[in-house]
């Protein structure tokens, strides 16, 4: 109530923000006459002038009005598109690092040119992020004309580019690409062995188109680069066979109380909770599963710790059979399970569910099971995009998620007013009792509107529902085809497989009499023009003429093949002479103008929504397809009490409301109270989904800090300067050799503290163990050392002299340059192998951490503690393995080297790894797809006294024994325990 009163008095926050931005628009408009008077060369020269002013210290905010005026004029000259005042406001919002909500058809693509140009003047690169390759390519070519006219370079990242092409694209002033490509390039860069092979050059400023889709809808799906694990696939088939023999219990709908849940458990072997999307074995189900899997279980019980992996397989098989449905959540294409995006309905080839779920679905569908993958690198979109120093976004629907944008990304949402008043009529929802009644009413509505000539766009929630509706329309005389409108009694269905073809269909959805069925988000990014899009129609005509000339007679069936038409289109279009194209275009332009007026007279595009989505934002996106730029239009949602949202989240409130209003068979209820009740249910779901995403982010933030630490270390190794912090937070940069010496000294100090400490009596020392550990870590033969009469400091000094001499000898024989390259490659491989194992450990930790809640402990706090302990242990292993590998290396003498591999004269001799164990693998003998060739390594036979194993990368041997001590270790850079305030190595550690 108070908020409403304040809003009336001082205006809403959005209104106040718009008020602050309007003077900027006035300044841009004031520059327009002078900028218009410039010649093309003078206008182009403004870019060099702006760059110089930035170099001289002028702020971008000061340049903004004039720079925006320059871009506006370039748009007018090159594209015949002049930025509206509201688009200037949108550009200013993006430049300030906020989200601009602009309705469909308001020209978001053109708006992005303003802040992209302005921020590119600094020379650090601007990334414009889109949802698919087609839009990235289209926008880079379309808007790229403005940038190139002004002397800026434009690049586009496509999924099939090689690294050299990606480097060129990222080196451009402005780079277009998809969220997936930007994220994967970041991960791939941090797996490379040469800085020169990196493709990205930093994360300065990103403008995210369809920001809600990328930062919210896809936030729960991390980007993962993985490699095959070794686990057999037999268990998936075995577990899958038992699921059909389990009896399904009653389905839990809504929130069930404990006693209700207990009663439901007696109805079958498993119960399905629709609201929380879980499926759980009951007591009888557990007993049956144990009987059927008796041969696999270690012991008698499925829930025993040693059977945890089998329990995991059973859980995933249940989810695959009960929760995941064919043609809704996935499709089977050419013997492969392909995921369907739950928000867009698009197929996502190449994407796989993790944790064995994808394999469980493959077993269910009786297709080949691909081996489970092990994660090599991963990042969520949330943490990737938070790397940018400045982030902005634009979409038609962000205000309903403003809280999430603010809390997760620190992004404010500003709603930009439309250039023309909205004329779309949003009709109240029609609610039916059953799904059958609803679908019959939808078909009748579509047929009736089509007879009038009014274009209809139907939004469905899944491919399955699209196909169902298409079949029903076929029966009513509206046949399925590859085109619609223009007087034909046909409809088209977007299967959301080819984005370019999808855009062509959506562009024609405004033609007179057109009927288009699409999943809710299909074709996003393409304007629906009333009367049709002449440019797209001209392309289609060119395609048809080329097909008529080149397609053999009798093969016309290929015209119904969407894949054939799509790939043929690109080649065919470029064969058409320009004069012919312009003639065809003019013909369709006149036709579209006539149809435009006819469709406006019919009240514009009519949106028919077949179901409410869990998020109001998705519903608003569908509504927003009608009524662009002041055009007329209408929308209506058709619902039934059997819809998922109504059944699961609507609770008894809506059902009670329906009874009060009275429901008869086939007669819908149309009432504002029902619509508001449904929106309340949607808000409840949105809140729940936000909590899930926030919860996942809190866990991922822990890994993100560790990932940044490891990636920073990798880069420092590549740069040859590794930075260490002292107790005062001061950084010291060490070259690779200095860093290795520091590590080796720390390890030796730890060994001395453990086995020959100053504070312990001689009788307590374990010199045999010290000798074994020194041999294990440094590869030294300590058999001739006699420490009997030496002090702790003298022992340390003797050992360090030998350790440092052995490394100096390597460097002397092979040269610093060769050894430095070997150091770098070995360090990188050890870091990568240990990081991979650490990710695996974190996955296992996360799986079971939720159980800590039963012990009255916060799982998140426990996860932070244990993951930190795992990370510290991993870093200790990395340090020790690096030292072990590099100290075990020794040069191959010419007489030892095989003739075929003997080094040429005057070349430094290559290095080998002492290999007492025949099964040990050289670090550089592993797969080196990402690594450059280094000095050759081979194996040598051990001397009789050498019984220690050299290190290995990966596997169990990658986890060498960590030195344990009763007292805390005093590092060389730690404060001295004597209390002097000096570093230990400058005080009592000086002699060491």
Predicted regions and their residues:
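Short Cys/His-rich zinc-binding micro-motifs
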Residues: 966-985, 989
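Conserved mid-sequence domains
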Residues: 103, 110-112, 119-123, 895, ...
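Short, Lys/Glu-rich amphipathic helical modules
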Residues: 453-460, 464-466, 719-721, 725-728, ...
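Hydrophobic, well-ordered secondary-structure elements that form the walls
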Residues: 458, 517, 835, 871, ...
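Extended, charged helical/alpha-beta scaffold domains that provide interaction surfaces
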Residues: 35, 314, 330-338, 344-352, ...
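Conserved P-loop NTPase motor core
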Residues: 1-640, 645-657, 711-712
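Intrinsically disordered, low-complexity linkers and tails
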Residues: 962, 991-992
């Amino acid at each position: 109530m108070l908020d409403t009163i304040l809003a009336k008095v001082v205006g809403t926050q959005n209104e106040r923000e718009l008020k602050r931005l309007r003077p900027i628009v006035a300044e841009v408009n004031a520059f327009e006459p002078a900028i218009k008077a410039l010649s093309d060369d003078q206008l182009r020269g403004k870019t060099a002038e702006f760059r110089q002013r930035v170099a001289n210290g002028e702020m971008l905010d000061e340049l903004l009005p004039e720079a925006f005026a320059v871009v506006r004029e370039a748009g007018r000259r090159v594209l015949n598109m002049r930025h509206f005042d509201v688009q200037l406001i949108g550009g200013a919002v993006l430049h300030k690092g906020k989200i601009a909500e602009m309705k469909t058809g308001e020209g978001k693509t053109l708006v992005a040119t303003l802040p992209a140009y302005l921020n590119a003047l600094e020379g650090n690169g601007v990334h414009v992020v889109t949802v698919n390759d087609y839009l990235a390519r289209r926008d880079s070519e379309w808007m790229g004309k403005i940038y190139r006219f002004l002397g800026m370079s434009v690049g586009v990242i496509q999924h099939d580019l090689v690294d050299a092409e990606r480097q060129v694209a990222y080196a451009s002033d402005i780079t277009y690409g998809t969220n997936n490509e930007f994220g994967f390039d970041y991960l791939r860069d941090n797996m490379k062995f040469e800085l020169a092979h990196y493709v990205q050059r930093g994360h300065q400023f990103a403008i995210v188109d369809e920001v809600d889709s990328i930062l919210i809808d896809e936030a729960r799906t991390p980007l993962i680069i993985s490699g095959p694990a070794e686990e057999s696939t037999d268990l998936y088939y075995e577990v899958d066979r038992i699921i059909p023999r389990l009896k399904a219990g009653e389905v839990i709908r809504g929130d069930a109380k404990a006693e209700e849940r207990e009663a439901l458990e007696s109805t079958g072997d498993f119960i399905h909770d629709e609201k929380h999307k879980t499926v759980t074995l009951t007591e009888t189900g557990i007993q049956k599963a144990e009987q059927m899997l008796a041969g696999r279980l270690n012991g008698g019980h499925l829930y025993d710790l040693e059977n945890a992996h089998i329990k995991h397989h059973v859980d995933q098989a249940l989810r695959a059979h009960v929760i995941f449905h064919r043609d809704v959540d996935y499709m089977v294409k050419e013997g492969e399970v392909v995921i369907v995006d739950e928000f867009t309905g698009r197929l996502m080839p190449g994407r796989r569910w993790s944790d064995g779920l994808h394999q469980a679905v493959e077993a269910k569908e009786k297709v080949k099971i691909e081996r489970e993958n092990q994660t090599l690198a991963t990042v969520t979109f949330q943490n990737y995009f938070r790397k940018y120093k400045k982030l902005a976004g634009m979409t038609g629907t962000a205000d309903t998620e403003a809280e999430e944008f603010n809390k997760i990304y620190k992004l404010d949402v500003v709603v930009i007013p439309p250039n023309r008043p909205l004329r779309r009529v949003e009709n109240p929802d029609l609610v039916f009792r059953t799904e059958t009644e609803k679908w019959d009413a939808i078909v009748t509505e579509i047929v009736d509107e089509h007879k009038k000539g009014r274009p209809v766009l139907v939004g469905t929630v899944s491919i399955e529902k699209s196909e169902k509706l298409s079949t029903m329309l076929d029966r009513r005389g509206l046949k399925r085809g590859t085109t619609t409108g223009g007087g034909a009694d046909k409809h088209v269905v977007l299967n959301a497989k080819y984005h370019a073809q999808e855009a062509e269909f959506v562009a024609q959805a405004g033609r007179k009499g057109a009927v288009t069925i699409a999943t809710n988000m299909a074709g996003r990014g393409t304007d629906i023009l009333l009367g049709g899009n002449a440019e797209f129609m001209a392309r289609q005509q060119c395609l048809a003429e080329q097909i008529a000339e080149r397609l053999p007679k009798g093969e016309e069936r290929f015209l119904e093949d969407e894949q054939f038409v799509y790939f043929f289109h690109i080649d065919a279009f470029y064969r058409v002479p320009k004069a012919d194209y312009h003639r065809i275009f003019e013909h369709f332009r006149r036709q579209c103008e006539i149809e435009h007026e006819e469709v406006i007279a019919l009240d514009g595009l009519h949106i028919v929504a077949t179901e409410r989505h869990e998020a109001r934002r998705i519903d608003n996106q569908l509504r927003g397809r009608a009524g662009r730029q002041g055009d007329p239009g209408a929308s209506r949602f058709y619902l039934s009490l059997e819809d998922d949202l109504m059944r699961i989240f609507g609770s008894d409130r809506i059902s009670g409301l329906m009874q009060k209003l009275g429901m008869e068979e086939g007669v819908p209820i149309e009432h504002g109270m029902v619509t508001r009740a449904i929106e309340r249910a949607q808000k409840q779901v949105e809140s729940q989904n936000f909590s899930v995403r926030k919860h996942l982010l809190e866990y991922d933030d822990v890994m993100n800090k560790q990932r940044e630490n490891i990636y920073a270390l990798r880069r420092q190794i590549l740069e040859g300067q590794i930075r260490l912090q002292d107790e005062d937070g001061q950084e010291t940069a060490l070259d690779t050799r200095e860093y290795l010496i520091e590590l080796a000294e720390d390890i030796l100090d730890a060994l001395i503290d453990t086995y020959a400490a100053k504070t312990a009596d001689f009788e307590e020392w374990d010199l045999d163990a010290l000798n074994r550990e020194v041999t294990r870590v440094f590869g030294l033969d300590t058999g001739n050392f006699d420490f009997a009469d030496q002090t702790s400091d003298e022992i340390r000094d003797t050992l360090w002299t030998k350790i440092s001499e052995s490394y100096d000898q390597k460097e002397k024989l092979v040269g610093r340059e060769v050894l430095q390259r070997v150091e770098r490659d070995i360090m990188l491989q050890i870091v990568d192998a240990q990081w991979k194992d650490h990710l695996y450990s974190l996955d296992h930790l996360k799986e079971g951490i939720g159980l800590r809640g039963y012990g009255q402990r916060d799982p998140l706090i426990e996860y932070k503690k244990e993951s930190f302990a795992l990370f510290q242990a991993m870093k200790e292993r990395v340090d020790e393995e690096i030292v072990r590998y590099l100290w075990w290396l020794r040069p191959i003498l010419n007489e030892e080297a095989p003739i075929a591999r003997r080094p040429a004269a005057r070349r430094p001799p290559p290095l080998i790894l002492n290999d007492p164990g025949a099964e040990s693998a050289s670090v550089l003998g592993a797969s080196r797809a990402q690594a450059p060739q280094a000095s050759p390594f081979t194996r040598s036979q051990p001397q009789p006294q050498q019984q220690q194993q050299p290190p290995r990368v990966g596997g169990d041997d990658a986890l060498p024994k960590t030195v344990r001590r009763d007292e805390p270790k005093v590092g060389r850079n730690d404060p001295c325990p004597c209390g002097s305030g000096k570093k230990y190595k400058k005080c009592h550690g000086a002699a060491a």
